Amino acid sequence: IIHSHNYLMSFFLLKKTDIFTVHDGLYYQSGAVNHKLQNLFKYIEKKVYKKSGLVHFISKFAKEKSLYRGDNFKIIYNTTPFEKIDLKYSSKVNWETDKIKIFTVRSIEERANIDLLIELAKRKRNYDIKVAGKGPLLEKYREEIRKNQLENIELLGYIPDEEVRKFYETADLVTVLAKYGEGFGLPIIEGYLYNKPVFASDICAIPEIIIDKNFLVKNNAEDLESKIEKYYEELPVYNFKKYYEENFSYDRILEKYRQMYDKFFKI
């Protein structure tokens, strides 16, 4: 079986792609940034679907924003390998112990809305914000943090999985912010795996994945701050880990993949 996640690879592949997985529609993504080759990407996306035996989407949102109009598709959410991989922690993570500890994992690019976290750090000095991930805007944002003399937010850059897991375990909450192009929101379920509240932007596939609409935020620092403060004032009872296990656990998602492959073999 040829199972591809890459539009260009499948487009240039001489053989037919048996199963093609869509994270974000190519045409939708290019439109979000007004790419000059948007019409070419539209052609490529449609061509790839025609060459694919079965199309798999990681969310309903990904399906809605795609150019796929056929009936031979499956929607299966993501899971996280952190559930099954037993890693040893080689180092400690440094938090300000008297502050609310906020962790996020993002690619440091325009759509990740790092500006919002920097603004939050300016407003709330009692928050300790750690951002893991690399990307083209990493140094730009680090310089902005230095210029504003913000000691309560740190861009960690790339860190190994064992450190990512340790940050998840020791954080008080997780944020997942986005301006566009969020076909699923993997850090949301990673936060739930470690039984953490996750506050995330009210866009794209995120409302599908979030445990409750009370954790959805508008893309401004005021609303994010308000939602976090309200949570700590009321301390509502949620079992985030159970929500993960019932909807995104490795075994549940693996079974759905098995069913998808069974469907393919029956075509």
Outline where the language-model segments fall:
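Short hydrophobic beta-strand element within catalytic cores of glycosyltransferases
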Residues: 188, 197-200
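Membrane-proximal helix-turn-helix segments that form the acceptor-binding/catalytic region
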Residues: 36-55, 68
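Conserved acidic donor-binding segment of nucleotide-sugar-dependent glycosyltransferases
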Residues: 212-222, 229-234
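Conserved donor-binding/catalytic core segment of Leloir-type glycosyltransferases
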Residues: 56, 94-112, 118-122, 129-130
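A charged, aromatic-enriched C-terminal amphipathic alpha-helix characteristic of glycosyltransferases
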Residues: 233-266
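Nucleotide-activated donor-binding/catalytic signature segment of Leloir-type glycosyltransferases, i.e.
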Residues: 142-159
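Short His-centered aromatic/hydrophobic patch
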Residues: 4-9
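Short alpha-helical donor nucleotide-sugar binding micro-motif in glycosyltransferases
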Residues: 158-159, 166-171, 257
